[in-house]
Every structure is written in C-alpha cells, then in structure tokens.
Design a protein with these regions (language model features):
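Terminal RNA-binding accessory module
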Residues: 350-454
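Generic beta-strand/beta-sheet core signal
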Residues: 8, 82, 203-205, 239-241, ...
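Proteins enriched for Cys/Gly/acidic motifs involved in redox and nucleic-acid/cofactor modification
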Residues: 1-210, 249, 264, 285-297, ...
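Short acidic/polar active-site loop segments enriched in Thr and Asp
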Residues: 101, 198, 234, 333, ...
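Radical SAM enzyme [4Fe-4S]-AdoMet core and its adjacent flexible, acidic
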Residues: 12, 211-232, 278-279, 342-373
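Conserved SAM/AdoMet-binding glycine-rich loop
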Residues: 76-81, 88, 194-318, 328
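Conserved beta-strand core positions
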Residues: 5, 42-43, 153, 200, ...
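Conserved, mostly hydrophobic/aromatic
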Residues: 165, 185, 202, 238, ...
Length: 454
C-alpha cells in the first residue's frame, strides 16, 4: 500500500517544531514525505487558531486540502487535522468540517502514525486527544525532520503556559507550563549541530520560566550555558521571554556566553498599567522600563524586540496616548503590533467597551509609524560599522545576496543586502561593512581579512 504523506504547517515557529516532530515519527513508521499534496495518500494540516485570522486561515487550508480527496484531483485517502483547532473545537469538529477524517490534539502528536494507519485501514472520524497537561514527550525531538533552511532550527524548550492573560486561549489548548528535561534539550541541540545547524532559536510559550516546574527555579541561564558549549553552533537566539520572569541570572548568561546573540524577543503587550492589569499581565511600565535598562546595561549592543496589542477592550484615548509616549521613550529595536482579537471563551471577549475594528487599525498604524521612524534612526547608526552576517540567499540581481546579523531573528526581522564579487552561499558567515540604511534593512559590502576583536 502506498504511504505517501504531505504536510502543511500553519501558525508560529512552535507549531513548526511540532510538525517537524510529527513528520519524523511518520517517516520512522514507513511513510514517505512528498511536497505535492496531489501525490499524497495522507494529508496533515497542523493548525493554529490563536486569533481569528489564524482560525480562518486554518479552515481555508483544510478546505483547500480536502479537494485532493477527489480522485480526479489527487490520491488523498485521509485528511488529518493536528494542533490547536481540533483541540479547541473537538466536540463540534466533524459536524462543522465533515471533510476531515481525523483530529490529533496538541499533546497527542506521538500518535500521528497510528492515526494515519487507522485512516488508511478505513476507519472514520478518528479522535486522538490527550489531557492538555500531559507531560512533555522528550524522546521524539531526535526524530525531527527540519523544515527550515539547514543552517538554522528552532528548539522548543517547553509546552503550555501558566499565565492567564484575559485575551488568550493558549492555556485552554496547550495546558499548563511543562518544561522539557535539560539533558534532552542538550542532546537534541547537539544532534542539530551535527546535522549542520549553526543558529539555534529558543522558543516556547514562555521561555523565561524554563525549568521552574522541574527544578524548583528558572533554569534558562543554565540551559544557555550548556548550549553555548555545543561544538558547531554559532548563534543562539532567545524568543518569547517575559519581563516579569526574566532573571538576573539569564541576563548574565546572555552577556557572558559568546554564542548567545545579544538579542531578545520580550513581548510586553502594552505600556499602560491600567491596560496591562485588564489584560491580566503581571508587569507594569516601571518593571518593563527597569528590565530594559538592565538588559542594555549588561549588553549595550542588544537588540530588543517586543510585541504590542492595541485596541484592547476599554483602551481609552489617554491610555493609547500613554502607549505612544512609552514606545517613543523606550525605542525598542524591533516591534510588532497586533490589533486586539476578540476570542471566544476568553475573559476579555466579555468585557464592555469593545473597540471598533476601524479604531484598532488606526491605532496599529499610528504605533507602526512611530516605530518606523525609530527603526530608521537605529539603522542609520549602523552605517560604517563592520558586522557579521549570516547569508540566507541571493537576489535575482547579479552579486547581491541577503542575510541577517546577530540582531535579526529569522523570518521576522530586517535583512542585510550584501554586494560581493565572489559567490556566497546560504549558511555562510561573512564580514560586511554597512554603507547604506533603509527603514528596516541595511546594505553593505563584503570585507575580506577583517577580524573581530574579542
């Protein structure tokens, strides 16, 4: 029997890691991955429904993939939906989407091959759902089949979240925070380095409390030091660390470990204390200001990325003005803005004074305009500097390549456009002198024979 499988992964980088693990399990059990869904016997869609837009994309993708069940279009004998969508809506799922043959929940990924076998055996409407607080399955990470470029990979260090933000459905779908064992993470990172991974990007719903559940205290600093010692890794990058739980020990490890990029993604969500309180956040403007100051004191060259939500229920003109002032004051190096999404089943969805969509979008545009000016000024300061750049590809134009510095995360931050008379290859580290700056990107030329001082 043919056992070809096609995979579509939606949503965040954490979802991508889950997809890579599932694909590895399927291959271990005799399935062959194909890029063309029309050739697949089984199609898996790993879904996201964190916000309304993600939910709509997931449903559209499922319906798009279902067309391959038509013999005139494809060979699909089973459509499996994995991840958040099935976990969140499992009771009504098959009534709403009868095209789907099985759902696999957020803690049941290790059963993906078993489910695929059942579908090929003729079973219908299979549900594989476990408790959302199920302990992490540590052994499957070594089976991952990377879907990223071969020189970088994400390392998912925990699952779930202990925060109870009033706007967020993640704890309902992913459960409480559960850390992976330290030694398992080091083993997986070592295997990734042996496969050629040079940049390791650490992710979780909340990375800053890693280890607290297993070891009685946050152990992110210990993990960073252990990863720093792995031969072959060049850059280690930290995402999704929250200011209220980011420890002095972690900051010290970031500053002292030479492979750890002076970069942090630290979502603050808002800059007004009253809004933060309504959001259920445990931070404050003062705490955020102090934590940013500590990071910049320890690492003057650090790039701090953050994320904001505008248009939260009850956000007044005064509160929004306070947010604008805070963004102008803090001058975050990288910043993204979401318009608040009213999510069914959350506390915030039932709050009074919901903000009109038009107002949300206006406020989002205002913050992004402020950040654009900040980013352009920061980019201008890079002109004349000599930076290490990781090459990611080549433009159609002759001798123009693109890459990233230590201050830029893959897929979300700016690029450096590099001129070189010699051919450069994805995964190369090159030295570049910056000659021009855009609003978010840099332009420069390769410099040969330059050595960075320790």
């Amino acid at each position: 029997m043919s056992r070809k499988i096609a995979f579509t992964s939606l949503g965040c980088d954490k979802n991508r890691v889950d997809s890579e693990v599932m694909l590895g399990i399927l291959q271990q059990n005799g399935y062959t991955a194909v890029a063309d869904a029309a050739e697949a016997d089984i199609i898996v869609v790993n879904t996201c429904c964190f916000i309304k837009d993600a939910l709509e994309e997931s449903i559209e993708t499922i319906l798009e993939m279902s067309k391959y069940k038509n013999p005139e279009v494809g060979h699909c004998k089973g459509l499996i939906v994995a991840g958040c969508l099935g976990q969140r809506y499992e009771k009504e799922f098959f009534d709403e989407l009868p095209e789907v043959d099985a759902i696999v929940g957020t803690t049941a990924y290790e059963s993906i091959a078993e489910v695929a076998d059942e579908i090929l055996g003729g079973k219908e409407q299979v549900k594989q759902l476990e408790s959302i607080d199920l302990a992490m399955q540590d052994g499957n990470g070594k089976l991952r089949v990377l879907s990223t470029a071969p020189y970088f990979a994400y390392l998912k260090i925990s699952e779930g979240c202990d925060n109870r933000c009033t706007y967020c459905v993640i704890p309902q779908m992913r459960g409480r925070h559960r850390s992976r064992e330290l030694e398992s993470l080091v083993e997986e990172a070592t295997l990734l380095a042996q496969q050629g991974v040079k940049e390791l990007v650490i992710v979780a719903q909340d990375t800053s409390i890693y280890g607290r559940d297993l070891y009685g205290k946050p152990m992110l600093d210990v993990l960073l030091r252990r990863l720093n010692a792995i031969e072959g890794l060049e850059w280690i990058r930290l995402l999704y660390a929250y200011p209220e739980t980011l420890t002095e020990e972690t900051i010290a490890a970031m500053a002292s470990c030479e492979k750890v990029c002076h970069y942090i993604d630290m979502p603050i969500q808002h800059g007004n204390d009253a809004v933060l309180k309504r959001m259920g956040r445990k931070s404050s403007q003062t705490l955020i200001r102090e934590k940013v100051a500590r990071l910049r004191a320890a690492m003057p060259d650090i790039a701090i990325r953050t994320t904001l939500i505008v248009g939260f229920p009850g956000e007044t003109e005064e509160e929004f003005a306070n947010l604008q002032s805070f963004v102008q004051e803090m001058k975050f190096d990288r910043l993204g803005v979401f318009s608040y999404s009213q999510e069914e089943g959350t506390v915030a969805a039932e709050m009074e004074n919901q903000i009109p969509e038009e107002t949300k979008e206006e406020r989002r545009d205002i913050i992004m305009d402020i950040q654009k000016s900040i980013a352009a000024a920061l980019c201008e300061k890079e002109v004349g500097k000599v930076l290490e750049v990781l090459i990611e590809g080549k433009l159609p134009e002759e001798n123009i390549f693109c890459g990233r510095t230590r201050r830029d995360a893959p897929e979300i931050d700016g690029l450096v456009f590099v001129s070189s008379e010699e051919e450069l290859y994805s995964g190369d580290f090159v030295t570049v002198k910056i000659r021009e700056a855009g609003d978010y990107d840099l332009m420069g030329d390769v410099v040969y024979g330059y050595e960075f001082s320790e």
